[in-house]
Amino acid sequence: MPSLRIEQHESHRYPPRTWVNAQSADLTVAIAVDFTTKGELLTKRAAGAAFVALPLEGDPLDAARLLWKAVRQRDARTLNIAGNGICTMAKHGWSQERINTWVYQVIGKVHQHHPISFIRSGGQTGADIAGLVAAYALGIECLGLYPKRFLQRTIDNLDVRRSAEEIEAEIKSWAAGLV
């Protein structure tokens, strides 16, 4: 199985790890139902030109085509998967399992034609963790870089502390459900 690393940033705040993740990948992939949230605007600013937005409501095959064009244009082999958290996505009818499946289908299709060597994310619920789930299920090395103490925002918009072991077990369980 691929390497799955769960690490924490030195800051308790979300923005510092957003900047590190965006600047450490060839391309940042924002997966969202609302691209106007503070987090999405920060992610786009941090990624600069190395950014592609994939609307979650779209067909996974159409999203894969859009992502494939972006990775080919930049010859991107490392991705930062970002996007809305589950608290935003749930308001639009999305469960974490459904997001995981959608992201897995998109990345899996691109990976067949343009191999991805590494995926990183901020590990938040919703799109971020779905990127790690997809990477692990597809055999792609991956890293979740969380705020200090592995903060995650819940469906109720509350920040909770997790352990690296809890997060790793959750990712592996969801990935097993995809393959």
Residue ranges, per PLM feature:
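Acidic/glycine-enriched connector segments
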Residues: M1-S121, G126-V179
